[in-house]
Amino acid sequence: MARREKNPIRATVSMKIGLSDSLLAFVNNYVRALRFSIFWMKENVKNPNEKGTLSKVHEGLYGKLKEDYNLPPKVSADCYRDALAIYKSWYNNPKRGRFPRVYKPTVWLTPKRSYTVDLDRMVVKITSVGELPILGYPRNLKEYANWDMKEARLTIRDGKAFLKVVFEKPKVKIQPKGSVAVDINMSEIVVGKDDSHYVRIPTRLHESHHFKTLAENLQKKYPRRWKENKRILHRIRSFHHKAKLIMEDFARKVGKWVVEIAWDLGANVIKLENLKNLIRNVNKLSAEFRDKLYLMQYHRIQYWIEWQARKHGMNVEYVNPSYSSVSCPKCGRKMVEIAHRYFHCPSCGYENDRDVIAIMNLNGRGSLTLSTAPQMRDVIPNR
């Protein structure tokens, strides 16, 4: 039996597929079977964590789901495994709220046995339904042509059918040949390896903060009416949603740009700041700076950088950011600010912008240089 790959790289791709009467009937039968399976487990499975639970569930449900709900053999197995996952999630929850009920029309499908995707013909074949055309898909779908297909979710929403497929590939071990560092600030993100090879990426924080301010101004203008008036409430929600989408879009694009810059500079290791407990002392900050700190989503940006790096075969390393913006990268002495965000070293005379100083110091830390510096716990964010 093949050994499961440890920490593989996964991506979920959503595709819009054609809707048919047979597909709607298939989904309806699955949802009814899923409801029955969950309540059957409530009565017959007292502890889902016990050994042999899956065999017991198979004996009690497999035949019934095939006969009473007209599900194909493999889909019947998918159905009771889906129900067991829902029941186990509820059972292991310490608070254990209301017993789970199924309302959304979703189907759990297993690759090759329950469904197959042909990217050349752009069709999806689902057991007992047949072939359905792929009507919509992301532009980078072809990038996953050589990845392995895993479990998928078939969902029906607003009269449209979507298939969300998980693609997976093993993580490749690489030999480090060079590194770049990333310094994330509110005004710009700096990516580079030294003071002559770096790129500045302006952020969109001011746009996001603008829409958040518009929403708050409406709440101040209508302190009582905004909760009851649907038009005002919709407007406020749309402003907050725009602010969130702007930063999410920026974070996704930054991940791609950082990887491209690293390739151009001949590096395959990306060093990021260890920002653990970044907002521990957030209450001591001003209200405006606190809002911008939340909107900036430092960890979200780092998440997409790491995801794109792993996808393209690069390593990501988190290093200690302590004093990286104020320590001289040449001699290590503390530097003095002589202008706005511009520092001078009184010892060796080196001068530069604090962001460039930061990437030089960050790039000199980590495993490539066998650093033994302890990880930082409290980080003061850059303005």
Curated annotation (Swiss-Prot):
GO terms for molecular function: DNA binding; metal ion binding. The keyword DNA-binding applies. Zn(2+) binds at residues 328, 331, 345, 348. InterPro entries: Cas12f1-like_TNB, RNA-guided_DNA_endo/Transpos. It comes from the Viruses. Keywords: DNA recombination, DNA-binding, Metal-binding, Transposition, Zinc. This is TnpB-like protein ORF383a. It comes from Acidianus two-tailed virus (ATV).
